[in-house]
Amino acid sequence: TLPGREPAFGRRHPLTIIREQVESIFEAIGFEILQGPQVEDDYHNFEALNMPEDHPARDMQDTLYLDEPLRALDTERPGTLLRTHTSGMQIRYMENHRPPVRIISPGLVYRRDNPDLTHSPMFQQVEGLLVGENITMADLKGTLECFLKELFDNDTSVTLRPSYFPYT
């Protein structure tokens, strides 16, 4: 027989590299990194976040539900879904920890979207939560500026603009 060949080694995906950089930066400034389930229940994805029953994010056309409606709870809304954000990890963490809280929760999220240049039914997201005494919007701004300058370049200019996103 012929001698064996050296196995071809792949490369890490660019999004994996960026995610690791994001996690490393936040760890360096004292944040804990949380990983959580991609299959989520209605409570952690919507209810515990005070999203009302008629919130647009709960619609079947926006959320990828996985099971039949929960008849036992007398609702027509299914109870298991692919998470639409990583906020469920914040709820899980706060159920078992008291402030101060300094966490980020990166991960894949899913939404019923028609793929185009700016939309995908599956994408990466990072959410952060900082809770403690004397935390202000200045802390948010400083954290974001520190993160972006470390990720991109120290000369990166950061501008924050208030906006409204009906999904969130």
Place the predicted regions along the sequence by residue.
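TRNA-recognition modules of translation machinery and tRNA-sensing kinases, especially anticodon-binding
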Residues: 1-168
